[in-house]
Structure formats: structure tokens, C-alpha cells
Amino acid sequence: MWMYSGRTPADEKQQYAESVVKAGVVAAMFWGVAGMLVGVIIALQLSFPHLFYFPDLAWTNFGRMRPLHTSAVIFAFGGNVLIATSFYVVQRTCRARLWGGSLSWLVFWGYNIFILLAGTGYLIGVTEGREYAEPEWYADIWLTIVWVCYLLTFLGTLWKRKEPHIYVANWFYLAFIVTIAVLHLVNNLSMPVSFLETKSYSLFSGVQDALTQWWYGHNAVGFFLTAGFLGIMYYFIPKRAERPVYSYRLSIIHFWSLIFIYIWAGPHHLLYTALPEWAQTLGMTFSIILWMPSWGGMINGLMTLSGAWDKLRTDPVLRMLVVSVAFYGMATFEGPAMSIKAVNALSHYTNWTVGHVHSGALGWVGYVSFGAIYCLVPWLWKRKLYSNALVEWHFWLSTLGIVLYITSMWVAGIMQGLMWRAYNEFGFLEYAFSEVVQAQHPYYIIRALGGLLYLGGTLVMVFNLWKTVKGGEVMPAASSAPVLAAEAAE
């Protein structure tokens, strides 16, 4: 089983590549604030359409700002968190420096150049129009090169490891890296109009194009926003709680179940469309099956705190990590439920889906990322966290923001679905489209308020981390975080 061992003096002298991890943390916080700010702006645009209406500035349009928001929070914030944490975790659990020397810096800078290429493209109207895959061909090619370097760096570090066992967090990181590479390559197969022009056309068309897109879109959620962040969960929760993973066997079941099941669930995004009925049913079936291994992972994460539950009262960082797992469980129950055709008939195309996505994005991805960064900054800069009280403020501001956001969207979405399908005694639609939109207005305002509170909490975090780096109390060497070590296999 996996236990904890303290660092030896030899371990302390071993040099790890920490500068690139620091850069990833800084970039993640920058893009996180930027992406959330754009999210608040577009939420206000939906609430008060004339507030940010500049007809002469096309880049301020909702249609251009919305993909900027999603890419900034998913790929810029989330991607930098994953790169930084994976580089940190693989070194510590392998007791080996990152392979490839400066290749890790190429990954960091190359990835952030991709973010700039994609984001500037959105603002000037250069986009493929494929959700979560909007960047055009030139940005896609650049990301492919960077991603190969990322894979080589990670695999090379695993290859030169000094620990005989590959820790479970690294399985999830590797699954995320490999699967995203396959998804990216297939979904972005396209032909440029000219190598001197930005426009390209997909090699797929019609229903095949839709299926390929949502095979990518769903599994971008499954492997970018789930598998990668589960790697964070399996390292940082045991580390912070100073407890071994509750069940290593359960983590094996969790891992392989996700690998084999998640990839089939994409068609549930295309229920009641031109997609063949058998494919829709297949997507629904695998989505429902997916609930069980997902909750197995949630139970494994929560039960890792066995014997350490009292720490939740005194450690707000650990509380944030644990609450993220609770949101993971909630989102992975709601998702399969919404894939059932009878439920999907009500929820599809409504704000219920928006609420579901953000319960996972803000609660699961956001909180597990924040928790990891709160751990990393003191470890990397060798300074005590400036203020636990500010972490408390961050936690409660953000939690209130999440609750306002997702509950308003749940209510708005269910109301929206019911109004769309309401008929009068003559068989005509009961409500005009404009009436449905008008009914959403109060909930849009609540959603914007929730997003503003979440952004406010993140700004509190930025201030706390800034004060930690610039003026925090220096940590004694003996307080360095312990390293996971394989003691003896059962």
C-alpha cells in the first residue's frame, strides 16, 4: 500500500525543475482572473444588453466574447494549472528532475502562445465555430507541436524515475495528455482555404461532423476537465490531509472504468437530432454506466480524510479541496441523469445545461485548482501562506457565488424547458419566444451576481498569494512537504 515517508537530507539536495512550475502557477492565476472577468462581462450583457453594446466594436460582441471566456477559463487557466501541477507531481512521485532540460519551458511558453493565437483570433472573428475547438488551423498545428513536447517531457520523466511504482496521479495525467492529443488531431482535421489565409473547412460534414465534434467536446470535458484534475485530487488531498489514498484498488477501478467508458458517451449531446437512434442510445447507456466509477472516485477522495476530518475546521485549503470532490460527485450524478432521453427532452438547449456545466467548472475544476495552488505557492516559494483568514473569505465568497449561479440557472432552465413545451387548448404554443426570454431576466441578474462573487473570491486569492510571495514568513527547511513513497505492496 502507499504510505508517507519523510524527506531525507539527500532528497532535500536533489534539484527539481521548479521555475517552470512557478511560471505555470502565475500564468494560471493571470488567465483565471482574465477569463472570469470576461465571463462576468458576458453575464451582464445577457442581463443588460445595452450595458456593453458598442456597435462599432465588433470584438465586444457576445458572440466573440463567449468563446474567449470559455477558452480562457478552460484552456488558459485550466491548462496552465494542469501543466504546472503535472510537472510538480511527476517529479516528486518519481524522485526525478523533468526530462528534456529546457523542453519544459518550450511547453510552457508554447502553450501560452497558443492561448494568445486562439484568443486574438476569436476577437477578430477568426474561428472554426466548433465549441471548445474554435482555434483555426494555424493555432491547431502549433498546439500539436507543443503537446508532443509535453507528452515527451512527461513520459521521459516517468522513464527515468527512481521510484519503482508509478503513482496513481500520474496515470490520470498521462491519460489526459494522450487522449487530448488523439481528440485534438481527429476533430481538427481540416483543409485551409490557402496557407496564406486563416479560414479552413472541416474534412467532416453533416451528422458525421456533429458526431466528431461532440465526441471531442464531451471527452475534452472527460479527459481535460476530469482525468487531469483527478490527478490533482489523488496527489494534493492525501498530501494536505497527511493520509494515504483510501483505497488504491478503488483508484485502479476508477481509472480503467473512466478510460473505457467515458470515450463512448459523446452522443448524449446529440439526443433528438439527426444522429442515428442506436448511436443516441449508446451514448445514453454509457453515460448512465459512467455514474458508478465517477462516484467510486468521489468516495475514494472523500474517504482519504478518514481519521483527519477534524482538519476541515482548521484548514480552509483542505476544505476547498474536499468540497471540490463533493461538486465532482454532484456533477457526475447530474450529467448521467441529464443524458436520459426523458430528462434531456426538458433540459436540452436550456440554461439547466449551463448550470450543470458551471457546477462542475466552478465547484470541481475551480476549487481543486485553487486548493492545489494554495499548496504549491508556499512549497515553491518556501514561505508560509500569508493569511488563512483570507482563504476563508475566498472560500465563502466563491461558495455563495456558485450557489447563486447554479441554482438560478437550474430554476431558469427548468422553467425555460417547461415554457417551450407548453400548449394551449388549441394546440398552439402557449408562450412566444420573447416571453420565455423575458421570464429569464431575473435569473440572469442572479447569475451575474454569482459570477461577480466568484471573481471577487479569486481576487482575494490573488492578493493573498501576492503577499505570500512578497512578504510571507520564510518556512524552515524541515517543514517541506513529505514525498509519497511506496513502502510495501500488499
Regions found by a protein language model. Name each.
Residues 203-212, 347, 352-354:
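Active-site-proximal inter-transmembrane loops
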Residues 128-131, 273-276, 345-348:
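Membrane-interface helix termini and inter-helical loops of multi-pass transporters
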Residues 2-4, 22-126, 137-158, 170-195, ...:
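Hydrophobic cores of alpha-helical transmembrane segments in multi-pass integral membrane proteins
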Residues 135, 197-205:
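Surface-exposed loop and adjacent secondary-structure segments within mature catalytic domains
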Residues 2-6, 15, 311:
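Long amphipathic alpha-helical scaffold segments
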Residues 9-23:
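Cytosolic juxtamembrane amphipathic/interface segments immediately preceding
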Residues 473-490:
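Short, highly charged, low-complexity non-transmembrane loops/tails of multi-pass membrane proteins
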